[in-house]
Amino acid sequence: MLARNRFLLLVVVGGAALAIISLSLQFLNLIPTTPVEEERPFHAADGGVGVALGKSRKRVFPMPHTQEPDPVAEAYGYCNTPNRSEQAWEGHSPADYKLLSVQVMIRHGDRYPLYSIPKTKRPAIDCTLSSSRKPSHPLLNPFISHMGLGGRGHWDSPLSSVPRLPNHSSCEMGELTQTGVVQHLRNGQLLQQAYKCHNLLPSNWSPRQVWVETTGKSRTLQSGLAFFYGFLPDFDWTKLTVRHQWSTLFCGSACDCPARNRYLEEEQRRQYRLRVSDTELERTYVEMARTLGLLTRTLRAANPIDSLLCHLCHGIPFPCVPVGDSGASGCLTMAQFAVIRRQQLDDEVERRKVGLYRNYAILAMYPYLNRTANKMERVAKDNEAGRQPRLGGEEVFTLSSAHDVTMAPLLSALGLEEARFPRFAARVVFELWKSPPATQGQPKKKAGKGGKSKAKDGELFLRVLYNGEDVTFHTTFCRSHDRHTGQPLCPLKNFLSYVRRDMFRVFNATSYQEACFRRPV
């Protein structure tokens, strides 16, 4: 008995001593403490103040220093190598909401460089397609076979002579690579899986319900076909018409806009001033030119970053030159590449601050956004309660296969200024949703003074996604919408008001025509 009491006393005294020592060490900062899970800070998605999960302890944690982006890591993200699984948030909505339409803009997939660096060997890349070569995809062989039936489809005349598959064993300049094809087979398949439970396109879809358009470049046409095949494998060619967009801005008959051109010229002058003032960039170009035995201005004109990105994305060593008559020799380096990429990232930061590009982007993308809004309105009208749907239906799926010079201004015009520059095979998705109709017993919304009570038909909402991420509440027209007030999605009317009126306020104008043709003060 006595021994047991002594043992218990020893345990109590020992525990107390350990507690005192632990508290003393924490007080002296010898043991780091970590906040509990519900107090641990995190980065807000939009770069704002982090919000703690769980109950608020009313404690403020200093935000850690945000490191400068790593130019090389950013470049690998730009490559978008299809070697990992990807989470896509397309097709997500509150229960019982109906998906009415989807409009997608894609940037073409990985391509061969548009420029070559003088005195260096061009990167050796095979642009034919083979399932035995990586990267590959289960749909690659069926896709190749299906493209052989493309003569059954309908093509706008400028596209009829464009090859439907990349086909050169030694890639031509700007040609889509097998990586680019696989990127878009994956993209299309991702959306097919996201929407298959929503019955977006019935099995007996009509030609009127699908709209596919592309610029005249083979890389955009082939990217669009790969995406569409991933989305709708073994589709019926006889139902498909592929339409040509002559402008990379997809502006149709509304491309004439003098003010847009002025803003673009001012933006290009800003870019030039920033480049020539960057002494590190200038030193790097001089070093690279000396290595290759070139004049610095000749190297600049060759836009070496385009070719170097191709080497990086395909795991090919950077170009080297043997000793020549000029005595120059050596290889271009990752450090030199990083300097050029760093300057490009700096340019993106200044571009957002100055605002010239955003003005250009709004005018450049208004025709496309207005067409997007019109399509949504037609689909919404076709789905009104008690209305007889139009014979053949409305366009419920639109695919626009475009370039970086299309998607970058689109992101800016939407107010997504913090979005990363469009990588290879980037995608922007617009989803139109309809809430369930009010049922008997649910209270109706009160009408305004002198107005009629609102019909029981469901309300319309919009989602915007960029590379699978829901960015709706980062857009200009929905940033201030309170999604916790029983409306978890962005009302379509916000988007319509923005496109028809609000986006021209920055020009003190009320319409696209006025903003485009008003004489500068």
Regions found by a protein language model. Give the residues of each.
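Signature for phosphate-centric chemistry
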Residues: L2-W211, T215-T398, A402-V521
